[in-house]
Amino acid sequence: MTRFRRVCALAAGIVVLGLPSLWAQKPKSKGEVAAIQAVQTAKTPDEQIKAIENVLTNFADTEFKNVLIQMAMQIEEQKGDFAQTVFYAERLLDADPKNVFALNVLASETARHTREFDLDKEEKLAKVDKWAKAALEGAPTAPKPRADIPDAQWDGARKDMQAQAYEAMGMAASLRKKYDESAADYKQAIAVGATQDPATQLRLGQALLDANKLDEAADAFDKALAAPNATPQVKSIATAKKDETAKRKAGAAKPPGGF
């Protein structure tokens, strides 16, 4: 999730850094200013959500509506609350139908929470593809949330948004057991992303392993292990998967009968 966190951190900066400067552009009522300041000074994620809802409820026409809903979506995603993440993502799309952050969150989180034997699996995966393709279409021209964000930084964020969309499609393809298609999507995510996420290499390795492309799978797991930003969890999984790949290669090399 390195790539996703980078994009989220940039977007979260809209609220932390951007609101005071926006107040200077358009005077707000004292009550709204105080309510928004409460969002910025909240100490815990739950306090932030409460403060955001206070603004949205009591100042329904606030010009910061989309920014605050997006912030709430990101908070709930980081908390791991899938239902609330979807709630805010859908709410954000209602307000801004082309919002790439919301499209990517819906695609990625739905793919992550879909299981092989879900009765509505294909319905969920069709939505994943729809959201991810819309994100891919919108990311290259996604407007800056703040004019003072450097062009190079925003260009990197746009690339990471495209990578996140490809990764969501890769997860959907894996759930359909279309492993070659899945691997192609993960390779696209790696190629286009400005931030290299070792978790994507892990997913690529698994797709290649499932496709019985053992040499390529081993290479992907090696790259995940070698990534400077690989977490201990990623390294542990990559090591286990490397061992699994090596055992399968050894088994495939044995002649019939195991002699």
Provide a role label for each language-model segment:
Residues 22-71, 253-254, 259:
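N-terminal leader/linker segments that initiate helical-solenoid repeat arrays
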Residues 27-41, 63-74, 98-117, 137-147, ...:
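Amphipathic alpha-helical repeat scaffolds of TPR domains
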Residues 60-63, 97, 140, 194-195, ...:
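Short coil turns that delineate tetratricopeptide repeat
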Residues 9-18:
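Bacterial N-terminal signal peptides
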Residues 57-60, 91-94, 137, 144, ...:
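Conserved structural position within tetratricopeptide repeats
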Residues 78-84, 112-123, 156-175, 210-219, ...:
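Alpha-helical linker/edge segments of TPR/alpha-solenoid repeat scaffolds
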